[in-house]
């Protein structure tokens, strides 16, 4: 087995001290928070069990515009303007209203780290516990670190939350497993097929000489290794270079007991698609900007907790709709309704509307709008998406659809297919 780069032996010196901000977790969400704090004089400590970029758990794809606006294009490997969707006996090719790109995980983490250098110090350390913290002191295997502002970006376990956490298979989690064989492909592909998983989907994401092929189940009780082996055989690639993870599919409170939660620890991964990178960027920016206001004296910690918590909660209706779609897909996948249902939602105008609305949940323009704080930026951003008939529908200035386009259509389609 490969030896990880994590510090060992004499290199693991004691770690103690007080900081302005402690960020626990050094992947997409945590590094994005640190990126925003780089424009301040705050003393920021980032800690993670692994070195930055060391432990990939994602298929690593995101809307290209997000990568462009975040200054991360140097990590891009392949870009796709279409999505190929396979169901039993039929294949649909959807032309998307925006492109997705696969990227190199180690490189994108390095780029994010470069954007936070200057104020943030990174150290490898493992959070101990329970308890993982006492008040505003975090307990690690190298010592205790304290800060008035603490961020949990450690993933679905929500380690810094108060009380015991529900574990799989009882938690609201999906499970995913994938392989990374050395192979090439031209298409971003999905399989919605009970041959592989009854409640979920399978995928193949090409990434410049590597195929990321995997299976995800909405039901954490379902085993996904055998289906992944079967999919690899069908795609014609060896089942090698494995990775997997649990994936949250329900929004959770973004603040609790004085702690800020972002990314998977707050359930920010989008249901149905299990897209977690874009919301990690999005909510990481919002949280980072709130913390900037605290360290620069424009608001208190309590105000930041309230504002960031409200910002995350403002998206609850969108997460609930995606969870309904996820449940609907799970119900029809084992039935004969699956293929005709996917065919019914495949007209180009409907695809453009659906993906446009999906895009606007975490719009890339949010990166560029750097006004006083995350909540204000959300209020000032007007999201626009095309309806099924090609008409465009605005999102109100408070971040909530004045007329949520398509709710009636989605509800009608769901009821007809159930």
Question: Where are the language model's segments positioned?
Answer:
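Extreme N-terminal leader/targeting segments of oxidoreductases
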Residues: 1-19
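Glycine-rich Rossmann-fold phosphate-binding loop(s) that bind the pyrophosphate
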Residues: 25-27
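Glycine-rich FAD pyrophosphate-binding loop
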Residues: 38-57
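A short alpha-helix-loop-beta-strand transition element characteristic
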Residues: 53-54, 69-84, 169-171, 301-302, ...
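A conserved beta-strand/loop capping segment in the N-terminal third of enzymes
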Residues: 64-113
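Predominantly flavin-linked oxidoreductase catalytic cores and closely associated redox partners
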Residues: 115-240, 251
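FAD/FMN-dependent oxidoreductases across multiple families
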Residues: 129, 144, 219-296
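C-terminal helical "tail/cap" subdomain of flavin- and related membrane-associated enzymes
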Residues: 292-387, 407
